[in-house]
Amino acid sequence: MKAYPNYKNTDQLWLPEIPEEWQTIKIKFAFWERSEKGYPNEPLLVSSQNMGVVPKTLYGNRTVEAQKDLHLLKLVRVGDFVISLRSFQGGIEYAYYQGIISPAYTIMASRNVLASSYFRYLAKSYAFIELLKSCVTGIREGQNIDYSKLKNHRIPIPSRPEQDQIVRFLDWKVSIVNKLISIKRK
């Protein structure tokens, strides 16, 4: 992708400037917080920085056992984004499956303002993770992201065709990196 000819300043410390044609919106206008409970028959999900939000059965590592009161866990739908206690380290995770997850997590449901594939990359970017760190509460190893703070920060919104182009470019670059990793392992 070519560099943009002109940029404009934003009022966001985490993102000082964006291409001139882009807009910014507050996160609360792109997502709403879902907190549905009472679905004990849904599969248990885990949030993984490497895999996204997936069923616990697919996640090989040891995880904390779910509480007995499964009806207290939050419902996650495919396409939601999940803020976990590790999001300040690795970004917000995309839900590839429907199920239930810890009530300590924040579920962000899309308002369909932007392409989820675009936000998946944005939510894992270094700059966005720095923004998440500025919204942390707590002092223990796993820390909460205060969604009431986060939702008032602005995110960059290119046009939908441009979002798609950015995703295609990043998918292509990731595939090259993955091929190089595969060659190195052989």
Regions found by a protein language model. Name each.
Residues N6-Y39, N152, P156, R160, ...:
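Non-catalytic DNA-recognition/assembly elements of restriction-modification systems
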Residues T10-D11, I25-V78:
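Sequence-specific dsDNA recognition surfaces
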Residues F119, Q163-I166:
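Interdomain signal-transducing alpha-helices
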